[in-house]
Regions:
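Short hydrophobic alpha-helices and adjacent helix-cap/hinge residues
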Residues: 2-8, 12, 21-176
Length: 176
């Protein structure tokens, strides 16, 4: 005869085993973009952005690679403001509602034009497409030995009036 405590423990293990196996089977990309979402939020905490008025709008332009990772950030505080996630239609006029713009890889053909339009509007731009910082995007997220790193385009940030903390800039893998 099995003791009740041991029986409950065995039942709990049987119930959790499939969930643990499923978590192991999830694509690595989901973990990567969850980490990138957290990274973007942390960068935003150490950024001074023009035109903030109680809400900081993080826009995702193009195909959304984040899945549900960004939804967990909705409403989180950024100084005296709250973070709002927006999915604008394409085009430079859509950028006017953004404070931070993530440019998806699906928009890589238009990356330079989008970065230029966003800079003119005072919007912090972020992408994880290779070479994005050299095309005018302010922060290029890079996967470096399974860690998120970034390259920073200082000229683009200055042109937009975006200021990143020197503490953040010390972590940059490269500064242009």
């Amino acid at each position: 005869m099995m003791r009740p405590g041991l029986a409950r423990l065995l039942l709990l293990c049987c119930l959790l085993l499939p969930a643990a196996a499923q978590a192991q089977a999830q694509p690595q990309a989901a973990d990567e973009y969850a980490a990138k979402a957290a990274f973007i939020y942390n960068i935003a905490q150490f950024s001074t952005l023009p035109n903030m008025n109680g809400v900081v709008r993080l826009c995702v332009l193009g195909r959304d690679p984040f899945g549900s990772a960004l939804a967990t950030l909705e409403g989180k505080p950024l100084g005296n403001a709250r973070l709002s996630i927006v999915y604008p239609h394409s085009g430079p006029e859509a950028l006017m509602q953004c404070h931070i713009l993530y440019i998806s890889a699906s928009e890589s053909d238009d990356m330079t034009a989008l970065a230029d339009s966003a800079r003119a509007a005072g919007v912090l731009t972020i992408a994880d497409t290779r070479g994005a910082a050299r095309k005018g995007v302010m922060l290029e997220l890079v996967l470096d030995d399974r860690r998120i790193a970034f390259e920073f385009n200082g000229a683009a940030a200055r042109g937009a009036g975006v200021v990143l903390s020197s503490k953040v800039l010390r972590l940059a893998r490269a500064i242009y």
